UniProtKB/Swiss-Prot annotation:
Cofactor(s) needed for function: Zn(2+)
Reactions catalysed according to its record: adenosine + H2O + H(+) = inosine + NH4(+); 2'-deoxyadenosine + H2O + H(+) = 2'-deoxyinosine + NH4(+)
Site-annotated residues for Important for catalytic activity: H222
Source superkingdom: Bacteria
Amino acids binding Zn(2+): H15, H17, H199, D279
Source organism per UniProt: Streptococcus thermophilus (strain ATCC BAA-491 / LMD-9)
Entry keyword Metal-binding: yes
SUPFAM superfamilies xref list: Metallo-dependent hydrolases
Function: Catalyzes the hydrolytic deamination of adenosine and 2-deoxyadenosine.
Binding locations of substrate: H17, D19, G172
Protein name: Adenosine deaminase
Cofactor binding annotation: Binds 1 zinc ion per subunit.
EC number: 3.5.4.4
GO biological process per UniProt: adenosine catabolic process; hypoxanthine salvage; inosine biosynthetic process; nucleotide metabolic process; purine ribonucleoside monophosphate biosynthetic process
Length: 336
């Protein structure tokens, strides 16, 4: 059997967090600009920005992000960061990526919501021009934040009409802030008639994913709980929801305690819409090439599986119809 060149495969990524995916060299550059001291040794720095291989919980995993927040407080920093993440993706043959970020986490020093979105989109455009990747931005509301603040952030974001800002998400502490707890914010985003994805099913609570499906949300970040819930999986498939799966991240946070607790094979057998993602390239010390290697190792995923999942990702993406057509053609050619 011919060995698969996982790096060479064309790839699509829908679930990648900006602040969790910065390269060490970019972290150092941003720290220099912000006049923040970092450990000189890369291994020591990595310990601060990469979560433990096994965390006690999702909240422990999220602690790594606190280290990055002070570095992303200017337009310049956000542009550099967005360019860096899209470049990393392009260099492993990702042809389309959606990079998500929370404006709130970059407003500590006076940036407006609009400024954060403009800065991120500028960085993504630079990478698009240089590497030929199509790179788009998603805006996250933080579910644990003050709801009136989040409502204002979402409204200001909705005023931005940039073709590279394509949708919304809610991230953060799912366990304590499930869909019902932030329902007014979800309804607010739905009223915009703009695309939306949603983190649910990462913290072991099937009700949260069920609520997300009932609210009509068609893309779901993680969906890990489907491994344990056959009836919910049936609903997921029946409603045409697409799962943004993040294997390494789920094993770290214990959303999936072992590979057997990860929903991929059950979702595949049920005919669910599946996409493969990194979640956080740096915090999880991964990239899509590594993820594909793991799917092949643990689940015997084939090149045809990867083609199918990438096709699903394009169809579920928030790209324009013209971009989707172009991407589907590029993907078909790459896998022919």
């Amino acid at each position: 059997m011919t060995a698969i060149d996982f790096h060479k495969l064309a790839k699509i990524e829908l679930h990648c967090h900006l602040d969790g995916s910065l390269s060490l060299s970019t972290i150092r550059h941003l720290a220099e600009l912000a006049q923040i001291d970092l450990p000189e040794d890369d291994e020591e720095l990595k310990q601060h920005v990469t979560a433990p291989v096994t965390c006690e919980s999702l909240l422990e995993y999220l602690e790594s992000f606190d280290y990055i927040r002070p570095l992303l407080q200017t337009n310049e920093a956000l542009t550099i960061a967005a360019y860096d993440v899209a470049k990393q993706a392009a260099l492993e043959n990702v042809i389309y990526i959606e990079v998500r970020f929370a404006p709130e986490l970059s407003m500590d020093k006076g940036l407006t919501v609009t400024e954060t979105i403009d800065a991120v989109c500028q960085g993504l455009r630079q990478a698009q021009e240089e590497f030929g990747i199509i790179a788009k931005a998603l805006v996250c509301g933080m579910r644990q934040s003050d709801q009136s603040l989040t409502a204002c952030i979402l409204d200001e974001a909705n005023q931005v009409r940039d073709s590279d800002f394509v949708g919304f998400d809610f991230a953060g502490d799912e366990l304590n802030y499930g869909p019902a707890a932030i329902k007014p914010l979800i309804e607010q985003v739905k009223s915009y008639n703009r695309p939306m994805t949603f983190h649910a099913g990462e913290c072991g609570c099937p009700a949260f994913l069920a609520e997300s499906i009932a609210m009509g949300i068609k893309r779901n970040g993680h969906a890990t709980i489907l491994a344990q819930e056959p009836e919910l999986l049936d609903e997921f498939v029946k409603n045409g929801v697409t799962g943004e799966l993040c294997l390494t991240s789920n094993l770290q946070t214990k959303a999936a305690v072992t590979v057997n607790d990860f929903p991929y094979l059950k979702m595949k057998a049920a005919g669910a819409n599946i996409t493969i993602n990194t979640d956080n390239r740096t915090v999880s010390d991964t990239n899509l090439t590594k993820e594909y290697e793991l799917y092949h190792k643990y689940f015997d995923s084939t090149v045809q599986d990867f083609y199918a999942h990438n096709k699903t990702a394009i169809e579920a993406s928030f790209a324009s119809d013209e971009e989707k057509e172009e991407l589907l053609a590029r993907l078909a050619k790459a896998y022919s």
